Amino acid sequence: MEALKYIEEKKRKKKIKKTIALLMVLIGLLILFLIKAPIFNINNVKIVSNDNEVALKDDIENKLQGIKGRNIFYVKRSYIESILKNDPYIKDVKVTKALPNNLTVEVKENKKIFTVEQNGNYYALDESGKVLDKKLGEDDLVKLEGITIQDKEIGEKITEDEKILEIIKDFGALINSNTSSIKFNKLDISNLSNISLYSNEVLIKIGGNFDLTRKLNNAVNILKSDKVDIKKGYIDVSVEGNPVIKEE
């Protein structure tokens, strides 16, 4: 009797295993059918940019033409990111898939902040010191002086000097985040202990590359002040304490 129960139990377990295996095969075939179905072929790629630059969006769309019509499950996010991150104008990429066949590509663009002149050529740089453009004309950017450079290609850093790059990055980040009406037109780093920033004809004496947020905030507040109304001269924010203001 016990032996009969054992045999029946064994048959029941075997039947359950077969049923589970069959279900897994059927589910696998269903999944395979679904992911290969034409409905999952990418037919729409939406480009979202922080600057809404039309030319860059068109360029991105051209680069991603090859993924249209491909199965959305087989196109890896990392593949799309690797295609776009080679573009010096693109700082960051985020890819979102929306089933059945839509992709959203969010790009954060590198902005032109500085311009450096060499032998009549003007290099436009982003806030990290990377070359974004090279042209004969001068852009309406912050002119960077006091740096010796060799011929550079788009996408390369303007210099190999890490200390200079750090200064460019620090100032670039602050200038890029400046939302006030005060604009800067020149940064002179020929003397790293006595860095100079200009807003039109007003010299802002920065001193060394430290405590920059405080220094620039002080300078901007003075330039915006109706009580001071300085148009030409200098503002010395290089040391702690009250800035020194000299009008000419």
Language-model features, listed with the residues they occupy:
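Cofactor-binding loop segments of dinucleotide-utilizing enzymes, especially the Rossmann-like FAD-
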Residues: 50
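Extended, alpha-helix-rich binding/interface surfaces that flank or overlap catalytic cores
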Residues: 47
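Charged, solvent-exposed interaction patches on well-folded alpha/beta domains
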Residues: 1-36, 40-43, 53, 58-71, ...
